[in-house]
Amino acid sequence: MGKARLTDIYLVRHGESEWNREGRIQGQCNSPLTEFGIAQAQAISSYFSEHLSFEQLKIFCSPLDRARQTAEILAEGINYPLEAITIEPRLNDFNLGKIAGTYGWEKVAEMDPELARLRLQNPLYFHPPGGESGSEFKDRISEFLDEIIQDKTPKLLISHGIVNKFIRGIRMNLSGKQMIELGESQDTIYHLNDFQEQEIKLPQWP
């Protein structure tokens, strides 16, 4: 069983949600886990239970239901008290404003080609109507990271694909475009230590 070092951060994306299945852009809208998403969360929990041990651990979670459900399933599997989970607003998904709920980014590109272009080419200037800008999004994540690295206890962060990309990108000092191009998968746990990154592909996945 692996022993986590004190500077370790583990990034987990929530399981599949109803809107994931429907192909809708979620942003900060709530959408519960599907049965498949619950099974995904259980698979992640099993991996942590079987392969990692922690003398101490802190779990931080996005306030959205899909992340909280995932966090609770994971916590139960490793005997981590649910009341000790920290709900962290700065781990919330990107506030996409009026485009949240749209059926896919292709539809957004039809409605606003320039907005869609910025998202991929210069995401820090991406600013959907009624939402937050890419630079604001990066700033809140950077602020959170600056806080948690002061405490060397291992940490498990359960949030969203775009949040995980920016966390990884900030630590590697990547540009906004490089961050958005990072791979991100629900069957992968990202283990960060200092400025190194390890991708842990789950051996058993629903």
Regions found by a protein language model. Give the residues of each.
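Phosphate-handling substructures
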Residues: 32, 77-140, 181
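Short active-site segment of divalent metal-dependent hydrolases/proteases
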Residues: 17, 163-164
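Generic beta-sheet signal
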Residues: 9, 57, 151-162
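Extreme N-terminal starter segment of soluble prokaryotic enzymes
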Residues: 3-10
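Conserved histidine-centered catalytic loops in small-molecule metabolism enzymes
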Residues: 55-79, 83-90, 114-117, 193-206
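Active-site-proximal alpha-helix that buttresses catalytic centers in soluble enzyme cores
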Residues: 7, 16-80
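Short beta-strand scaffold positions
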Residues: 61-62, 139, 157-159
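Domain-level recognition of soluble alpha/beta enzyme cores
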Residues: 174-200
